[in-house]
Curated annotation (Swiss-Prot):
UniProt-listed InterPro entries: NIP7_N, PUA, PUA-like_sf, PUA_sf, UPF0113_PUA
CDD domains hit by this protein: PUA_Nip7-like
Domain PUA residue range list: 87-161
Name of the protein described by the UniProt record: UPF0113 protein AF_0058
Matches recorded under SUPFAM superfamilies: PUA domain-like
Family: Belongs to the UPF0113 family.
SMART domains according to UniProt: PUA
Signal peptide: none
MF terms (GO), sorted A to Z: RNA binding
Length: 174
């Protein structure tokens, strides 16, 4: 599959997602390429590399930042690279971090703080250093956190950075 530039509709969807998460300036520093196959994978490459990709026709180039369709879905690499604001984030303590990286869900007692989001929202799970550990789905709104018992699941693990070691789930889970 060859790389191509995103079409107008795809670019609009990608720009909207980048802007929502505070990375609107990403496109001024990097170029986007779409690799169409079973899914439309979006890759970010440097402007210098972008100039020679057409001549090389590589199988892979740059960093996969997500997939585009009716909406843009960040990849784990994309979240680490692109998220610049605190929107839809949950910060966990060390124990919560360890359990999440082992594939477990986040319990209310492991959450140190959370930005504002609703129930069933896609959230980005972070450690105390602001590293994105993975992507989850909230079972409750952030407003309900203080009223939940510590042993209640607050965020369901969809995919995490420990995934490549376990090989149990696929990245298609979200």
């Amino acid at each position: 599959m060859a790389f191509r530039q995103p079409n107008t509709k795809e670019l609009k969807v990608i720009r909207k997602a980048l802007s929502y998460y505070g990375s609107g300036d990403f496109l001024s520093h990097y170029a986007l390429l779409v690799k169409e196959g079973e899914k439309k994978e979006v890759y970010g490459v440097s402007k210098e590399l972008y100039g020679v990709i057409g001549e090389l026709n590589p199988h892979y180039a740059g960093v996969k930042i997500g997939e585009v369709g009716r909406r843009f879905r960040f990849s784990l690499e994309g979240t680490f690279w692109l998220l610049r604001n605190s929107r839809n984030r949950v910060w966990v303590n060390e124990r919560g971090e360890m359990l999440f990286l082992y594939g477990r869900d986040i319990f209310a007692g492991s959450v140190e703080r959370a930005s504002e989001f609703g129930e069933n929202s896609i959230v980005f799970v972070c450690n105390r250093f602001d590293d994105v550990l993975g992507i989850g789905r909230s079972r409750h709104s952030s407003d309900e956190l203080s009223n939940l018992p510590e042993d209640k699941v607050f965020v369901e693990n969809l995919v995490d950075r420990g995934e490549y070691l376990r090989h149990q789930k696929t990245y298609l889970s979200f």
